[in-house]
């Protein structure tokens, strides 16, 4: 069993590169690209993430993909409880033992869920914050899924591929503004909170990671459903170089009906989807699905 290194009593020990590799060897784990496994091996980076997440000591933190537990330990130091969702059964089996070894007495504050995060709709505790090093290949769907199913999530900080971070935090009019940007804005305010270098991971990815912080707000007031609004967003960006009149023709049933909806929403039919904010998409959905229909 990998034991914690001795550190000054005032500073709780965190796992470093040697600890992570030794622990992985103990359980026969080799990081896989399929699951997007890149483990954080730098204690200072862990402390930076936890500090940037601004976690209160009364909060329950949801962590997705805890892996070998390096970030988990930092979160346990800051939060009242940590609920970790892990898809890999080998990693999940080892996590409670790691918590006991590195944070004696904190195991009662640690709750493990063996599952695919995209399938989780219930948790042992209602989380108030999301802090996670997310696999690059599923980062956006996971964030949107969790915000949809856990309204108790009020804020968070996620580490994702740097260009994905830019897209999540993009604003209307930007070249990288797209489906992730608009859908995320339904749930809250997203902002870029920093960049993480490649050398703090094992194995080291080929690109930098970005930190995205979010604060939840109420969804737009509308009689249209979230599904109806998101359908407009998907249609608008499926052909993002086309005018909205053309891009929404399939969604509306015809170009003329798309134009009618756009005009009813007070929008220019010749505009493109990348210039509209979430409230504009809500108005388009409302025009297509009137309350008295």
From Swiss-Prot:
The keyword Cytoplasm applies. InterPro entries: KsgA/Erm, rRNA_Ade_diMease-like_C, rRNA_Ade_Mease_Trfase_CS, rRNA_Ade_methylase_Trfase_N, rRNA_adenine_dimethylase, SAM-dependent_MTases_sf. It holds the Pfam family RrnaAD. PROSITE patterns: RRNA_A_DIMETH, SAM_RNA_A_N6_MT. One of its GO terms (cellular component) is cytosol. Keywords: Cytoplasm, Methyltransferase, RNA-binding, rRNA processing, S-adenosyl-L-methionine, Transferase. S-adenosyl-L-methionine binds at residues 38, 40, 65, 86, 116, 133. It is found in: Cytoplasm. SMART domains: rADc. One of its GO terms (molecular function) is 16S rRNA (adenine(1518)-N(6)/adenine(1519)-N(6))-dimethyltransferase activity. SUPFAM superfamilies: S-adenosyl-L-methionine-dependent methyltransferases. It comes from the Bacteria. Its EC number is 2.1.1.182. It catalyses: adenosine(1518)/adenosine(1519) in 16S rRNA + 4 S-adenosyl-L-methionine = N(6)-dimethyladenosine(1518)/N(6)-dimethyladenosine(1519) in 16S rRNA + 4 S-adenosyl-L-homocysteine + 4 H(+). NCBIfam families: ksgA. HAMAP family: 16SrRNA_methyltr_A. Belongs to the class I-like SAM-binding methyltransferase superfamily. rRNA adenine N(6)-methyltransferase family. RsmA subfamily. Specifically dimethylates two adjacent adenosines (A1518 and A1519) in the loop of a conserved hairpin near the 3'-end of 16S rRNA in the 30S particle. May play a critical role in biogenesis of 30S subunits. This is Ribosomal RNA small subunit methyltransferase A. It comes from Paenarthrobacter aurescens (strain TC1). The lineage of its organism: Bacteria, Bacillati, Actinomycetota, Actinomycetes, Micrococcales. The gene is rsmA.
């Amino acid at each position: 069993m990998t034991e914690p290194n001795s550190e000054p009593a005032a500073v709780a020990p965190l796992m470093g590169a040697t600890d992570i590799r030794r622990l992985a060897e103990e359980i026969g784990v080799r990081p896989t690209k399929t699951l997007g496994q890149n483990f954080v091996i730098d204690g200072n980076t862990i402390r930076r993430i936890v500090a940037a997440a601004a976690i209160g000591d009364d909060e329950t933190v949801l962590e997705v993909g805890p892996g070998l537990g390096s970030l988990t330990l930092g979160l346990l130091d800051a939060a009242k409880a940590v609920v970790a969702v892990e898809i890999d059964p080998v990693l999940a089996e080892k996590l409670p033992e790691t918590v006991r070894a590195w944070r004696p007495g904190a195991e009662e504050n640690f709750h493990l869920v063996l599952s695919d995060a995209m399938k989780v709709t219930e948790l042992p505790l209602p989380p108030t914050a999301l802090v996670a090093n997310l696999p690059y290949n599923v980062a956006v769907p996971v964030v949107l899924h969790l915000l949809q199913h856990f309204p108790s999530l009020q804020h968070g900080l996620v580490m994702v591929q740097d260009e994905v971070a830019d897209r999540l935090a993009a604003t209307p009019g930007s070249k990288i503004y797209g489906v992730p940007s608009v859908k995320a804005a339904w749930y809250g305010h997203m902002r870029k909170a920093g960049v993480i270098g490649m050398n703090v991971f094992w194995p080291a990815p080929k690109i930098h990671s970005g930190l995205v912080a979010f604060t939840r707000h109420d969804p737009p007031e509308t009689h249209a459903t979230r599904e109806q609004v998101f359908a407009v967003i998907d249609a608008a960006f499926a052909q993002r170089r086309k005018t909205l009149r053309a891009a929404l023709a399939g969604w509306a049933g015809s170009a003329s009906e798309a134009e009618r909806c756009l005009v009813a929403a007070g929008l220019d039919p010749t505009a493109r989807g990348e210039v509209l904010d979430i409230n504009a998409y809500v108005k388009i959905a409302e025009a297509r699905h009137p309350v008295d229909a």
